[in-house]
């Protein structure tokens, strides 16, 4: 499927990446497949739950990126894949998988996807969502309490010990690889409209 377009959406935690992914889904509907880097956290069956809670999940080594690259290549070749899923309540990969079918537009979303050369080189359009750190941590707190069963103390501890340092070490430097930087994430309507127009043009070029 040489006409496939692969879009990478990166940036710090809680910065609005998913809002932009939804906008692309709304625009292209069934012609979009999405791969979330978060689903490719490594399996830790041999580590007790209390110890899994202490792992650094914001370092590139936390992810099974080679599997994501393999799955991305398969989708680009027109093959269906079984994507892993991750259970945040137990800090481990879940037994269930998600069937992802090939599509004209493939979106890869994650905080560290631009920090991985083998993944980065497969992306036709690279978008980096840039949002103020205070806004990002507030969004993360709301999300983790509401959707992931976390308590406030554990969220703040994780943010200060791993999330913030890893953002400064890996996420922020990877911004230089972006084709387009979107300030204020999904709330920047002007930037979103510009990005969507660019994607439409790219799709048209491949038709």
What spans do the regions from the language model cover?
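NTP-dependent small-molecule kinase module
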Residues: 101-102, 142-145, 164-207
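The conserved Walker
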Residues: 13
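Post-Walker A helix-loop "phosphate-sensing" segment adjacent to the P-loop in P-loop NTPases
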Residues: 26-34
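Hydrophobic positions on the alpha1 helix immediately C-terminal to the Walker A/P-loop
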Residues: 20
